[in-house]
């Protein structure tokens, strides 16, 4: 989802046997992301499947990206079959949450 929809490029892709996980390092415009894909991931609990309840869960698991054009971003997501979980306006800005293929919520804010 991150590569296809946000334009990040993978510059390193490793498999770590002790973790039983693949780690992909992505880059775009000087920003880097490190994503893990486990062989046997745990399912997301029901209370983490909606933005409001997920954001109340203690822990580091939230990421947000800024966009200049929410309509164009959403159109690309819809064309690629991305699950749009929630849309709202906050302080005059368009906000959208999408789910990645594993159900993890990712936030986008139009500035």
Indicate residue ranges for each PLM-predicted region.
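Vicinal oxygen chelate
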Residues: 14, 24-25, 33, 65, ...
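Short, P/G- and charge-enriched loop/turn segments at secondary-structure junctions
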Residues: 11-12, 48-54
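Core segments of cupin and vicinal oxygen chelate
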Residues: 1-32, 79
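Active-site/binding-pocket entry motifs
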Residues: 32, 39-42
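Short, charged, solvent-exposed linker or helix-capping segments at domain edges/interfaces
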Residues: 38, 45-48, 75-76
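Loop/turn position at the start of each blade in beta-propeller repeats
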Residues: 19-21, 58, 91-93
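Helix-adjacent hinge/juxtasegments
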Residues: 35-38, 53
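Eukaryotic phosphotyrosine signaling hubs
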Residues: 60-62
């Amino acid at each position: 989802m991150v590569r296809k929809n946000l334009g990040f490029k993978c510059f390193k892709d490793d498999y770590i046997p002790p973790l039983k996980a693949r780690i992909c390092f992505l880059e775009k415009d000087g920003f880097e992301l490190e994503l893990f894909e486990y062989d046997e991931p745990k399912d997301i609990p029901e209370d983490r499947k909606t933005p409001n309840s997920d954001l109340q869960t203690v822990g580091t698991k939230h990421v947000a990206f800024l966009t200049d054009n929410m309509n164009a971003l959403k159109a690309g997501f819809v064309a690629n079959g991305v699950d749009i979980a929630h849309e709202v306006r906050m302080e005059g800005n368009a906000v959208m949450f999408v789910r990645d293929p594993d159900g993890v919520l990712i936030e986008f804010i139009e500035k």
